[in-house]
Swiss-Prot record:
The keyword Zinc applies. Its cofactor is Zn(2+). Binds 1 zinc ion. This is Protein SprT-like. NCBIfam families: PRK04351.1. It comes from Bacillus cereus (strain B4264). Residues 7-147 form the SprT-like domain. It holds the Pfam family Zn_ribbon_SprT. GO terms for molecular function: zinc ion binding. Zn(2+) binds at H67, H71. Keywords: Cytoplasm, Metal-binding, Zinc. The active site is at E68. InterPro entries: SprT-like_domain, SprT_Zn_ribbon, Uncharacterised_SprT-like.
Amino acid sequence: MDEQEIQRLVEEVSLQYFEMPFLHKAVFNNRLRTTGGRYLLKSHNIELNYRYYEVYGEEELVGIIKHELCHYHLHIAGRGYKHRDRDFRELLKKVDAPRFCKRMINEEKEKKIYKYECMECSLQYVRRRQINTKRYVCGKCKGKLKPISKTS
């Protein structure tokens, strides 16, 4: 789906569910990570997360578009457009838009695990962050630490 298709889809959803035209721009923003979309107050544009379209399909994207259009139309009308406002929640129910989008299934980042061993007492330390072995010593016997392994 490209920029023109998403613009057309947002305009269609606006007319179908809100019976009002969408007169601004709708674009995909690849930098969005934790949200399905956002409505920009100053420019009145809507930005959408392309990954939600890839992972969940057009149906979830339409739900996100309806949610952002609720912000848009209420803000344009001068009514309460924030999540906590009654006008916003009532309009969400009216158009059957989700209040929150689904959680993104993100590929778990490889969690590096560093293992260190005391050269004196053989106590092992497991850490998620690397330790400067020249600066830090064993907490039990004050012996030097040596790295054993780094797993990812």
